Amino acid sequence: MHDFPDIDFTQRFIFDESDVRGELVALERSYAEVLAKHPYPEPVAQLLGELMAAAALLVGTLKFDGLLILQARSSGAVPLLMVECSSERELRGIARYDEALITPGAGLQDLMPDGSLALTVDPRQGKRYQGIVALDGVDLSESLSNYFVMSEQLGTRFWLKADGHRARGLLLQQLPAAQITDPEERDASWEHVVTLASTLTAEEMLSLDNQTVLHRLYHEDPVRLFDVQPICFRCSCSRERSANALASLGLEDAQQLVIEHNGSIEIDCQFCNERYLFDATDVAQLFAGGGVDSPSDTRH
């Protein structure tokens, strides 16, 4: 069964009789757009999809106005995975990899040994926050769950799956004691929902709609499912941002680059592959304080 809304989305749910909330995410279009920009090998595409699902879940969990950045680094076949998701639920992502070192069926520890995962919250107002954890789990789900074990008072667990076509995720998080105040009962309630979630197979997670998933896992528990929140792919690059980067070089260096590159500078967006061209006239106009016009020389 594959009866999802015709959008990418997150969807929150709560347990009426225990202090636990949950979030589900389903990505297809935004995942496909990221993969269309870069034809990644299957194991890399799967890891990137899982990280995209994680970012979407976290944006629904962390209350802030700005940008969430998940960045995984290693010295292995995949030195970089990066996903950005805004509080408006706009996603983009990228991976760097050494194709010669990629093997079919490779997992996180094969591709990113001795890796680390940085979670950065960059609010539009206020201080930037970053936390880092080792990528020491068997997969991204376990590694991200470990991050929250280290940094949060409340229990938080992730289940993430991707297959190159769809990316899905499930998050469970303890809430402050309200329904259940006895510590032992509270722990037992948490273990109950986590144990049941851990029975979900990759095939079920990738193919079943949210109502069916929750019924299979928690048909004996009162669960309330809320409305979906749309997610989309959107790159934040622009000609103006590229011009600002060029301006940071200074007039003399920018003019020299134009000469060295046969009359025009090309700035490429690493996320979406959009290209922005600047010639000598653009550079002169930029440093004269007039900004840069938006000509037809922006290319995909």
Curated annotation (Swiss-Prot):
Its annotated compartments are:
Cytoplasm
The record, for CDD domains, names:
Hsp33 (cd00498)
- Tell me the leader sequence span: none
Where on the tree of life does the source sit, at the highest rank? Bacteria
**Disulfide feature:** 235-237, 269-272
Keywords annotated in UniProt: Chaperone, Cytoplasm, Disulfide bond, Redox-active center, Zinc
- Recall the GO molecular function terms of this protein's record: protein folding chaperone; unfolded protein binding
Query: What does the record say about PTM?
Result: Under oxidizing conditions two disulfide bonds are formed involving the reactive cysteines. Under reducing conditions zinc is bound to the reactive cysteines and the protein is inactive.
- Give a yes or no for keyword Magnesium in this entry: no
One GO cellular-component annotation of the UniProt record comes to: cytoplasm
Q: Which InterPro entries match?
A: Heat_shock_Hsp33, Heat_shock_Hsp33_C, Heat_shock_Hsp33_N, Hsp33_helix_hairpin_bin_dom_sf
A Pfam family (short name) is HSP33
Give the record's family classification. Answer: Belongs to the HSP33 family.
The family database entries (PANTHER family) matched by this protein are listed as:
33 KDA CHAPERONIN
By its UniProt entry, which NCBIfam families does this protein fall under?
Answer: PRK00114.1
Which protein are we looking at? 33 kDa chaperonin
Source organism per UniProt: Pseudomonas syringae pv. tomato (strain ATCC BAA-871 / DC3000)
